[in-house]
């Protein structure tokens, strides 16, 4: 099997020749070198965003939201997975608010919200992550990397943390949308924190 790496619009797309599924491809959304395909989101009171010496993306603590959103080529809106590693280094609220596309709308995966330990997806049937069935408590330690994977299909959202399934939610026929407010500026794909410093790396998308 031959592995080819092709640069497309600043993204690196890795394809395996001979694969049974030609749609299987991995898009490196953040390569640790530049943010050419990203734009800082104009949140009020936002913190600084930069790449540190280790090639990790740092979203520094702001008054409330700090983050950036995708401005590169169009990404799939269903049948894909996003994987990343994230950690909280300062603060007590969410260190990874991952806004992602779903068909004609968007939603946000929250890690560490509402005081630092809530996970969930905002919003389902107009209920945010603290109010719908995806909301749960998860203890995050500061300065510890967590492996995160989000799978989006037409019928289901699934989330794993460190290989363990923590959210498995049927969404077909339901109202999927974003919590009203500034976070709506994170579309089509965005990452943000709330009054917290978050560090991320190895951000990838894979079509399924």
Regions found by a protein language model. Name each.
Residues 1-7:
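Bacterial N-terminal signal peptides
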